[in-house]
């Protein structure tokens, strides 16, 4: 059973106990009221009270005492039910704790597996980038590189924007334009890609020649293969001691980012829910 199942049972038991405690309080109040009624009857009896009236009042008192006994019987029954449910509540709380510990262990195991998988992919991408850079350097020296492989002249970028296409209209296009309007060189696919270009080669070139990589992390981003390819390339550069990745969270929660990449969730990030495009540009100016 998962923790939600036990939590629901605990909530039900706590409600049952609270209801029983209210019933006990109600019965205690009834008992107090009946005792007051008995006292009231006693105060009406004096030396002039006739035998018939006295007998009537005694029957009245007996009825109140019977009501009091009934209240006490109900209270005892409610207290017994509370004791039973309290014992069951304690058991369910222990079961909830075990379920939570089991779920936490599973989450940690899943995160560890993901980190190992990510580390393996990063190593592969790192080797790929190192090979690509070495090949580009070699072909440049031998003047054998084509204009398709490396644009001439070599262009340096301030920022490479990694994003999912679904986020272009929401944030990415406006951010790219704002950065360019503020004098930054920006690698953004709508600025750089032309018909017939090799997407992989253009991305590799942008990653290799950008000072920073802006990563627009969104629910769409974490599902894309190309964005993961770009992110792995940036992580490979960071492993060489350079701060590269600048995360911006867009319509995504910390838990979602943590499931995608624990190391990425640990980075200080801007968030489009609280930062405007102007705020983001101002923060990037201070790098």
From Swiss-Prot:
Enzyme class, UniProt record, top EC level: hydrolase
Record site feature (Important for ADPR cyclization), residues: 226
Matching InterPro entries: TIR_dom, Toll_tir_struct_dom_sf
Active site: 230
Pfam families: TIR_2 (PF13676)
GO MF annotations in UniProt: hydrolase activity
Signal peptide (UniProt feature, chain positions): none
Keywords in alphabetical order: Hydrolase, NAD
EC number: 3.2.2.-
All copies of domain TIR, residue ranges: 155-287
GO biological process: one example: signal transduction
Catalyzed reaction equations: NAD(+) = 2'cADPR + nicotinamide + H(+)
Entry function: NAD(+) hydrolase (NADase) that cleaves NAD(+) into nicotinamide and 2' cyclic ADP-D-ribose (2'cADPR).
Assembly information from the UniProt record: Homodimer.
Domains as described in the record: The TIR domain alone is active and produces cADPR (residues 134-258). It dimerizes in crystal structures.
Official protein name in the record: 2' cyclic ADP-D-ribose synthase BtTIR
Organism: Bacteroides thetaiotaomicron
């Amino acid at each position: 059973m998962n923790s939600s199942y036990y939590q629901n049972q605990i909530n039900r038991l706590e409600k049952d106990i609270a209801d029983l405690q209210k019933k006990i309080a109600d019965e205690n109040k009834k008992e107090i009221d009946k005792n007051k009624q008995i006292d009231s009857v006693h105060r009406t009896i004096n030396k002039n009270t006739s035998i018939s009236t006295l007998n009537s009042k005694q029957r009245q008192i007996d009825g109140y005492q019977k009501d009091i006994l009934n209240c006490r019987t109900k209270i005892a029954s409610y207290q017994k039910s509370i004791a039973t449910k309290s014992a069951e509540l304690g058991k369910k709380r222990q079961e909830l704790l075990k379920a939570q510990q089991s779920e936490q262990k599973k989450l940690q195991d899943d995160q560890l597996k993901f980190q190992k998988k990510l580390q393996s992919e990063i190593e592969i991408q790192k080797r790929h980038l190192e090979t690509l850079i070495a090949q580009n350097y070699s072909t440049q020296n031998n003047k054998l590189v084509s204009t398709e492989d490396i644009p001439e002249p070599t262009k340096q970028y301030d920022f490479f924007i990694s994003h999912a296409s679904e986020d272009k209209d929401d944030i990415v296009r406006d951010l790219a334009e704002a950065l360019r309007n503020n004098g930054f060189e920006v690698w953004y696919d709508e600025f750089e890609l032309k018909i017939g270009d090799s997407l992989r080669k253009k991305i590799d070139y942008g990653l290799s020649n950008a000072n920073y990589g802006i990563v627009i992390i969104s629910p769409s981003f974490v599902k894309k293969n190309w964005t993961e390819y770009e992110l792995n390339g940036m992580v490979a550069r960071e492993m060489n001691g350079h701060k590269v990745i600048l995360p911006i969270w867009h319509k995504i929660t910390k838990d979602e980012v943590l499931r995608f990449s624990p190391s990425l969730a640990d980075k200080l990030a801007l968030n489009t829910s609280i930062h405007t495009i102007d705020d983001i540009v101002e923060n990037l100016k201070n790098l």
